[in-house]
Amino acid sequence: MKFFKHFVIAIVLAVTTSCTLDKTDFEAEINRDVTEYFEFKEVTSFNSDNYKISIEALNGTFYKGYNEIRLTITNTQTNEALNNSEVTFLPILTDSDNNKISCPHRYHLVYNSEEQFYSGYVVFTSISNPMENWDLYISFTGSNQTHTFSQLVTVQNQTNMNLNMTSFTGNDGEQYFIALVAPQKPKVAENELVAGIYKYNQPTEPAGTFPDPSQFSYAEVENYTLLLDPRMPEPSMGNHSSPNNVDLTQQADGLYYGVVNYTMTGNWTLNFMMLNQNGVLIKGTEVPTDFTPGIEGAKSELHINILF
């Protein structure tokens, strides 16, 4: 019995030491401070037909994943802002074979009368590279005329893993996208988790004159539920989870809100099961709750990895 007790204690110490060493080495390897961005700065500006168009985003940068945007239009002859116009916004990715696709976005921008800008969002699905370029196609009405133009922009890689995204085909055959919006910098605590969920609208008519928005249409998924099961997948963590998590549901702004409880820093996997408005499973698998020390944790077929 005495030998057995010493044996158990030795095993516990070995697992604890291994966990601590792995975690320490892991943190030393990444050595990355996560920066939170709160200030909107200009990403790009350009002039067309006596108007100046300026587009702002957090940190003045477009990243792969979710980007909130603010657009202003100024008449360069009168120096007056163009207010409450109908402004459309369409991002298009062109590859080396001239194939063109888009990504989730708000096509009709919404005018903010208090701060006098047009608001929207874009979820870039890839970064700019020598083989692929992103262009923004924008139109608006000013001086009783419709003005249209395009602007080449650069999309950078998102180094903050707390803002990762994923795309997938659901069990219903539709193409979906989930993009994390917040928190940018989680704490060891219960954190409000915010995500956007979008679906590609398959065209029902032949393409018209390019860029035909009906061929590049996306919708905010409505009244779905994103079941949440966070785990620490590192082998030393033994499939560790946490209590008090809250599944994500849609709120008035169209985004999905829940709660994720991070009990320690490190590598986490947000395992999801997505249900439609009728409770039908669209994507995701249940993750076993077994304690598995020394084995990498299982993941849902629908998941996003984060790190803090």
Q: How would you label these PLM feature ranges?
A:
Residues 78, 129, 140-148, 267, ...:
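Short acidic/polar inter-strand loop motif in beta-rich domains
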Residues 127-194:
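Surface-exposed beta-loop interaction hotspot
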Residues 123-130, 261-267, 307:
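Short, surface-exposed loop/turn segments at beta-strand-coil junctions that are enriched for proline
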Residues 20-100, 106:
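Acidic/polar, low-complexity intrinsically disordered N-terminal segments immediately downstream
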Residues 89-104, 219-246:
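Short amphipathic beta-strand segments in non-cytosolic proteins
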Residues 110-123, 132, 249-259:
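Aromatic sugar-binding surface patches on proteins
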Residues 64-77, 189-212:
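Beta-strand-rich structural segments
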Residues 15-18:
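C-terminal motif of bacterial Sec signal peptides marking the signal peptidase cleavage site
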